[in-house]
């Protein structure tokens, strides 16, 4: 059920409102725990889809990354020129239009 909810959120919400018995409430509580992406799962650059304590790191060219506990981007990972989050001692060096790579 978790996969169905992540792919088809509208259908998932419809099922919750359609069934109001105890099993629907229990299922809703289980669903709430899977709304955020766990460490190692894909995320968007905004990072709002990562679970608490995680942030979106290691972006690719499309602006997607992986949820991780680290607070900065390591050497060799993509970074935004306008909002660089490279680790200490690294700079975001331009590699294309609007993005770069963390390097020394």
Swiss-Prot record:
**Signal peptide interval:** 1-22
Annotated tissue distribution = Expressed by the venom gland. Not found in the whole body.
**According to the UniProt record, where is the region 2 X approximate repeats with cysteine pattern C-C-CC-C-C?**
36-102
Report the subcellular localization: Secreted
The protein's superkingdom reads: Eukaryota
Q: Where are the Domain repeats?
A: 36-67, 72-102
Query: Does Transmembrane appear among the keywords?
Result: no
Disulfide partners: 36-51, 43-56, 50-67, 72-87, 79-92, 86-102
- What is the first-listed, main subcellular location in coarse terms? secreted
Keywords of this protein's UniProt record, alphabetized? Answer: Calcium channel impairing toxin, Disulfide bond, Ion channel impairing toxin, Neurotoxin, Repeat, Ryanodine-sensitive calcium-release channel impairing toxin, Secreted, Signal, Toxin
What additional remark is attached to this entry? Negative results: does not affect alpha-7/CHRNA7 nAChR, alpha-3/CHRNA7-containing nAChR, Cav1.3/CACNA1D, Cav2.2/CACNA1B, Nav1.2/SCN2A and Nav1.7/SCN9A channels. Does not elicit an increase in intracellular calcium in SH-SY5Y neuroblastoma cells.
Q: Tell me, in a sentence or two, what this protein's role is.
A: Probable neurotoxin. Induces potent, selective, and permanent activation of ryanodine receptor 1 (RyR1). Does not significantly modulate RyR2 during toxin exposure, but surprisingly RyR2 activity increases somewhat during washout, suggesting a binding to the receptor. RyR1 assays of recombinantly expressed domains 1 and 2 show that domain 1 causes an increase in channel opening, while domain 2 makes this activity persistent, probably by binding to an adjacent receptor site.
Family from the record: Belongs to the xibalbin-13 family. Double-knot toxin subfamily.
Q: What is known of its domains?
A: The presence of a 'disulfide through disulfide knot' structurally defines this protein as a knottin. This toxin contains 2 'disulfide through disulfide knots' that are separated by a short linker.
The name this protein carries in UniProt is Phi-xibalbin(3)-Xt3a
Organism of origin is Xibalbanus tulumensis
Taxonomic lineage is: Eukaryota, Metazoa, Ecdysozoa, Arthropoda, Crustacea
């Amino acid at each position: 059920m978790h996969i169905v909810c992540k792919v088809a959120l509208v259908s998932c919400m419809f099922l919750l409102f359609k069934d109001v018995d105890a099993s629907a409430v229990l299922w809703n509580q289980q669903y709430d725990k899977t709304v955020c992406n766990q460490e190692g799962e894909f995320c968007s650059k905004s990072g709002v889809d990562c679970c608490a304590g995680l942030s979106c790191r290691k972006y690719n060219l499309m602006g997607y990354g992986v949820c991780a506990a680290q607070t900065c981007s390591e050497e060799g990972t993509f970074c935004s020129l306008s909002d660089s989050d490279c680790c200490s001692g690294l700079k975001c060096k331009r590699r294309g239009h609007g993005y770069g790579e963390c390097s020394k």
